[in-house]
Amino acid sequence: MQSNNSHAFRQLRFLQVYSVALSAVVALLAWQTFFHNHNGGRFREITVERVNIVEKDGTLRLVIANRERQHPGIVDGKTLPQRDRGAGLIFFNDEGDECGGFTYSGEKKTSDMGFSLDQYANDQIVQLQYEDNGQRRHYGLKMWDRSDEMPTGKLVRLHDSLKALNDTAALAATLRNLRAQGLTGQERLFIGKTDNRAVGLFIRDDRGRPRVSIGIDSGNNLIFQGYDTIGNPIQLKSNL
């Protein structure tokens, strides 16, 4: 009986030692894997839905994501509510706020693509864009002016406060007033192909009013036209 107990004890002791040794080997392998991956590694292929690139302190600098998991943007350090955005890349500045990006989407009925550069604390001021809804299509380079008096954070807070009042008329009137003052941004220049199939250079003044159009229309006719501040055509001087 004593011999059997001694044998059982030795077996139990062996299992304990084996378990400890196996745990140590697994822990060592896990540590080596962790250490290797955190000090550079090479991968032939990786499949993910989203990648966040951050600084050492955790500040977000770049997001690469599919449409479903795309970042909604950060303004004044606050993440915006989730919204529909195309797959692609979103850029963030040294302070962690969104400062541009490259997004795209497309199917048979509609497609769009845009590479945007944002003014500091404001919306886009330069964009290379393409939009197609199956019937109308335009693409080219567009530029805007943005007001320092109405940065994106301030505009978002104003919009949210008005929306909370449940007064759509007041919201619409306020936005119209801001646009009239040029506080929501004004398009200044477009170089490309328009919805009506004209290709050329189109310039607006600081109120967003069309002033100069130079290009070729859909019938291959020359466009060389100026406009006054209320939209009346004026003659441009030309040596053509």
Task: Give the location of each predicted region.
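Single-pass membrane-anchoring alpha-helices
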Residues: 1-37
